[in-house]
Amino acid sequence: MAESDFDKTQYIIPNEANINFLECRTAFGGLTEKEKCYAHYLYKASWEGALICLLQTSPEAPGIFLLFQKLFSSESVGSLKEKALKSSVAPTEEEFTSFLTYVAAFYGNIGNYKSFGDTKFIPNLPKEKFQTIVFSSQAYATNAKSVVTLWSDCCEAMYSLKPKLRQLGFGEQGISTYYSSNCNKSDAEFIQGFLKEKNIEGWNTRLFKEINDKGHVTYNLRLASTALSAEDCSAEKKDDVASLVKSYEYQGTTVKITRGDYAGLLKKVVDNLIMAKGFASNENEVAMLDHYVHSFTTGSVEAHKDGSRHWIRDKGPVVETYIGFIESYRDPFGVRAEYEGFVSIVNKSMSAKFADLVSSAETLLPQLPWPSSYEKDTFLRPDFTSLDVLGFGSSGIPAGINIPNYDEIRQDEGFKNVSLGNVLSAHSADQKITFLTEEDAELYSKLKAPSFEVQVGLHELLGHGSGKLFIKKPDGSYNFDHKSVVNTETGEKIQSWYTEGETWSTKFAELSSSYEECRAECVGIYLCLNKDVLRIFGHEGAAGDDIVYVNWLNMVRAGLLGLEFYTPENNKWRQAHMQARYVILRVLLEAGEQLVQLTRIAGSDGKPDILVTLDRNKISCVGQPAIGAFLRKLQVFKSTADYASGKDLYDKYSAVDAHFLEMRNIVLARKTPRRMFVQSHTTIQDGVVSLKEFEASASGMIASFIARFPGDDPVLEKLWRDDLPYHQY
């Protein structure tokens, strides 16, 4: 498909996109001065590292960021607008608004690809008008050469919608700056074999391939660290990475492990973590920060795991935080993780509900549709808190999190669940509800927030927190009774398991993220029918039935909306959660008995529309058994490391046939833009921390980023320009 033969509106953020402010003043006001200082330095660490996301998104993203910082550090939005509208080839008012919308969306996603869906977005105004705005700026008047250089270095890529640039991915299916542009999936698979042999995990790595004049290939596996060489760089703790930093010959190919990826940015993270340590509340927080500092200094994943262990033990802190290379959704191979850092404040009243859910977990787990042999030997009671986000530095903000993602810690030592309360409440604001009857839309609007609260709780605690991985240990022993445990799908003894060097994410690779989200979503809708669960969240009788109905209706509707995140040209899903919800929709449609119906209709505007209906009387007798049978298969294939069976099952329900492709066209025509979040900013002067808030608008988003990152950033610019030769698309 040529660049001019497709609907460009799918790659534009409309001016009416909702922008919400994440309110946290009340929670922040409840902190002591010491806690505010602790939160402030964690906030700084989280956001300084968030610039790494630019380098992990696209070749041009850091340059666009630097351009915007230069423009808006020099003058206000109002001043720039006044000058731009007076120029000889002035943009219209609407075009200037489109410019601001693009800037806000770029900041909100920390890059020019959507954090939810991984598709590119471009400015909704001509390039010439965008240039007029840039060249009307005070920054241009002060230093034209610098502004022109930045603009010329990123403007073509900013606007390009060549097929492979439209989404993140491998080879011709997209771009990924986790890899040099000459890498494809086979390179990632080859290096994964090397990593397994050396017992190294790839969370904090990038892979760049170099080919010399004689055609000899050298793979450069870059570790994120402030350390730049193999020299031991840690005085206090053993530098377990230094000995790995060298060249290897692997299957006739040179593999070179180097340190120092993102070094200058991680130095700022480390400096602020060290400052935060002075305001920690207990020894677990001190030890946690020490290990994080060691991890970001040396590139050690093991140190980050140790920090995560202390984080788990830090029960019920008032100020909650997590930081590092955490989620691997955006790596097309599903192994390398995006940077994220957050700091938040506990909402005590809401957290009490989640604590009650944790207390009930041991009675709820046996109700899941698999034998007890597929469950962890001991339920490790996790923290489950509702948090108000103070700062979340990454490409997107989730509604709930279950971390850490390290299998051996989750299985043997525990984890934490968090629900981000001010994110959930922001989502509950009025918005247009598509594809439902008027009656359903009214009930949905009323109960979406409380029903989603139940779903998030179950999804995180008993979804991600349930199930066992069957492992054969190096000494030949098993962590399950391999002589008696039976595969529920074959009736035979267990034939497969995880071995040393294998994890869930490496074994299931690119399938792992969506598959696991689907498993957790299934647990949520399966268990939400439980009366005790509903009672914990304050829903009983008919009101509880309505919560169940809206939760299931939301899942079914989300499955239809998921089609927006499917790319038919390469048969790829671009968003793990939305693929998962589409899979669940397909399972429920297959259950039959008119439980779920998708009906093509003419909308009130006369254009094609779809009506989603769910028979609430059949949820328990048709829907729940169907989800239970499917969920059992998901768990068994996960437990037994049976990638082939898991892939066959998941691919079957992920398939989008001609019927659903037609529906996809309607979904795209009626899609509503995803909301953006403006976050507060903290400053400290003479030991006193202040909170600054911003308006919920594009201008407010811009002001918040200028407050966080005033002026130029030579560290980021050098990292960007050093990377560019490896990203030739």
UniProtKB/Swiss-Prot annotation:
Database matches in InterPro entries: Dipeptidyl-peptase3, Peptidase_M49
Entry GO CC: cytoplasm
Keyword Flavoprotein: no
GO BP terms in the entry: proteolysis
EC number(s) from the headed UniProt entry: 3.4.14.4
Compartment(s) where it occurs, according to its Swiss-Prot or TrEMBL record: Cytoplasm
Superkingdom assignment: Eukaryota
The protein's enzyme class: hydrolase
Active site: 460
Requisite cofactors: Zn(2+)
Single GO MF descriptor: metalloexopeptidase activity
Cofactor descriptive note: Binds 1 zinc ion per subunit.
Catalysed reactions, as listed in the record: Release of an N-terminal dipeptide from a peptide comprising four or more residues, with broad specificity. Also acts on dipeptidyl 2-naphthylamides
Entry keyword set: Aminopeptidase, Cytoplasm, Hydrolase, Metal-binding, Metalloprotease, Protease, Zinc
Name of one Pfam family that matches: Peptidase_M49
Residues that, per the record, bind Zn(2+): 459, 464, 517
Protein family membership: Belongs to the peptidase M49 family.
Protein known as: Dipeptidyl peptidase 3
Native species: Nematostella vectensis
Name of the gene this protein is made from: dpp3
